[in-house]
Amino acid sequence: MYTNLKVRFLFLVLCPLLLIHPDPGPALTYAAGSSPEKILANHVGFLPRGAKFCLLEGDSAVSFQVVEQKTGRTVFSGPMIPVKADLGKYLVGDFSALNEPGVFVIQAGNERSGEFRIAEDVYEEAIRKSVRYFSIQRCGPSATGYNAPCHVDDARRRDTRKYQDVSGGWHDACDVRKWVDATLYGMIGLSRAAEILQPSWDRGGIVEELRWGNRYFLKMQEPAGYVMNHIGDVFYHGDQNRWTDNIPDTPDDRLIQTNPCDPAGQFCFIMAQAAMVRLTEKSDPAYADTCRKAALRCLQWCRKENQGQDPNELGAAAAACAELYRSLGGREYRDLAADYARRLLELQVAGENNPAWPLRGFFQTARGNPEPFRDIYRGSWHLVSLCELLELFPDHPDAPRWKKAIELYCREYLAPMTARNNFGIVPYGLYTGKDPGGGRRIGYYWYRWFMEINQPWWVGINSNLASAGVGLFKAARLLKDPGLAVIAQRQLDWILGVNPFNSSTVIGVGRNNPAHYDVSYWFNPGTPVIPGAVMNGIGGTSNDMPDQKPGEWETCEYWTPMVCYTMWLMSELTAGKDNFR
């Protein structure tokens, strides 16, 4: 069922060449009144050896040229051909063969793209902006937060009403709340960028930022081992979303929701502390030991309470134990990671294909609940964890099962689904039962690219795309399958402008950033425009067509998981450029 994506696109490109003979020629000129930048290409650009695609709305094949911006020299020519798929009528062009560094535009007839770069460090500036984003979102007695110092008086426990110092950390989004399970992703994204890239420009800044964020998370851990839930909504929506007088133990102190945060958040806390052990054990052994003890206490509580039931939670649990093994060694963490992975694989749909069930490899929601698993923001831990276990323990007795599960999920589910839309993005998920909106069906299942909007809470797809991209890129390396790296690149392309709105949803990166969610009506000063922030992302209509909704929270609010996974994906692509070949 699965064919390598590069092979698929070579077929699409080479067949029309029998009829189309693009002339490299000189750079094209633009006709009077032509509309600029209708051709969609990643606003930031591409790695020299990476996948490179462009799109143009239409249904008739045309030739396109990649033109060096400075000289007007045509460096590549090829066809853009119509692909019948979801999300509109588009022509798709592939210029992955172009490896030359520089600044370029794409032209096709009277249409053009905006500028983009091809360079080994093409994503460095965007990553640096996202790192800096966290310092501007600092909460507590900082010198860099946009309204510093703030919330120095956080907070009063809801259960006892006693004051407990939990100041520090970061604001989670375009508000001033601090949701533990979501804001923890800042620790994941920053630590992955630091370890994957080991950037020369960092000079200790990422670890310093991590330690600031971790002030809050360590303070939110209870003696029992679990991490409390948040300073967010306690009695009604937004009741803690406000500024305070910064004087501890006064009536305007915000409240801590003291119950445990969700299981995935607990396991992300363990991952974060394990990473901090590695990043600080040489410079500050005492701090590293504090993080080690915090991780183990949380793991003990999670095991006692049998945390981890759905694919995301079990994947996060396996990843957390793998992180502990990387930091501490010890067979017990390897064995525990493998045990969580075994429970995860029990949820994978791995039966034989038939016309009514043309997909396999995806995961059920839980034991006894056959509904396909969907999650919009927590990320693809079910895929990422299996990749990390296979990479870390290639000789484990279960390694062949992990590899097979990765193959099934990527080749029998994600790859065929991404081929069903022109942009190559992964789906939000599959559905049984009635149509969730959009009338999209494959065999027995309905599917959507975007989360349903007929409910009180929904958000855009940036975290879903970027986290899947991380997993796909890891799988490309492990399976030696460049086609999966191509799909990973296309997830980032959508976020950075290859979408129907030609809009980058990373603030201060690329062009046409939509208006961000302005909360100044709620509290003042409101969250400013922050370069490096990643928005929730484009959402969908009830009929599952793209809808940007500029200025609305569902699509245009900053949110930590989106920042984490986008930064992580850019780091993976940069460090693993050979995965494309």
Predicted regions and their residues:
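Bacterial N-terminal signal peptides that target proteins for export
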Residues: 1-11
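Bacterial N-terminal signal peptides
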Residues: 10-23
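Boundary at the C-terminal end of the N-terminal hydrophobic targeting segment
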Residues: 22, 27-31
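Glycan-recognition and catalytic cores of secretory/periplasmic carbohydrate-active enzymes
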Residues: 33-38, 65-88, 99-101, 105-114, ...
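Contiguous beta-strand segments within globular domains
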Residues: 38-59
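Exposed aromatic-hydrophobic patches
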Residues: 90-96
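Interdomain boundary/hinge segments at the C-termini of tandem beta-sandwich modules
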Residues: 118-120
